[in-house]
């Protein structure tokens, strides 16, 4: 899956994070949503923004429009950007990023990074993006709304502690498990209250906004390599609260996904 032709080394460390600047004009400005020409991700982003975004006015634009407008400080931009981490041989994941125009900017890296979140593999989709990206867009919106009146201090101030998820159902898609997690361990986790289901079931629960249910999502390269980065995420299907958001740099190709350690941490809060 191609996003933009832009490739970046480590934009904001590929986290939901911001520079410590007060962006108090966000709600009064228009956000340009960049559709890069990719026939897979563009419709998902368009639908997600249309159905979710209410914090500011927005308009859709092309990559060419972005290149001509990026130096205009009257605009914010939401755009998909491929990310290449230092140890990777090629970009592994796509981030959805919101930046502010800057007069001197030559590339995205030169612009004010408002918020960025991993949304998909860089090239080959997993098939779960259509279900999960609307929730990720809503997380970006909620984070900005919370941060408008003060300095941006990063995602860790926005993640809800897992301890507050007791009483909620936890659904882990089988596709989100690391290859190091075997069936015996899965059965053990099921006894501790984790529901491990097919990805289609997880997506259906998320799309229906199932009450008091956390659903997993993993963003990793389609073909991981040593040095690739994997993100493990748990989101409340109804409120889109973010309960788990962790980054792992892979030492082996089979490490992408939720590990036994992740599942133990989550199960201990049941």
List the model feature ranges, each with a label:
Residues 13-95:
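Start-of-domain marker
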Residues 13-24, 103-270:
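C-terminal/domain-edge helix-coil "capping" segments
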């Amino acid at each position: 899956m191609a996003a933009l032709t832009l490739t970046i080394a480590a934009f904001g460390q590929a986290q939901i994070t911001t520079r410590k600047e007060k962006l108090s004009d966000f709600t009064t400005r228009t956000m340009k949503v960049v559709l890069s020409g990719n026939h897979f991700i563009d419709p998902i982003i368009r639908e997600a923004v249309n159905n979710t975004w209410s914090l500011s006015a927005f308009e859709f634009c092309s990559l060419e429009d972005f290149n001509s407008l990026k130096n205009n400080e009257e605009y914010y931009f939401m755009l998909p950007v491929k990310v290449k981490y230092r140890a990777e041989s090629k970009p592994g994941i796509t981030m959805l990023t919101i930046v502010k125009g800057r007069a001197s900017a030559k590339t995205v890296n030169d612009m004010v990074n408002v918020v960025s979140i991993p949304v998909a593999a860089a090239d080959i989709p997993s098939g779960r993006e259509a279900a999960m990206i609307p929730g990720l867009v809503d997380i970006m919106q909620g984070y900005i709304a919370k941060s408008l009146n003060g300095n941006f201090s990063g995602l860790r101030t926005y993640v809800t502690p897992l301890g507050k998820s007791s009483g909620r159902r936890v659904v882990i898609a089988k596709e989100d498990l690391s290859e190091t997690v075997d069936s015996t361990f899965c059965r053990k986790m099921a006894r501790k209250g984790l529901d491990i289901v097919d990805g289609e079931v997880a997506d259906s629960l998320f799309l229906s906004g199932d009450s008091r249910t956390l659903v997993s999502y993993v963003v990793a390269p389609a073909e991981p390599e040593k040095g690739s980065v994997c993100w493990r995420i748990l989101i409340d299907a109804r409120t889109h609260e973010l309960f788990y958001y962790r980054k792992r740099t892979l030492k082996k190709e089979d490490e992408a996904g939720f590990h036994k350690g992740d599942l133990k941490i989550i199960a201990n809060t049941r």
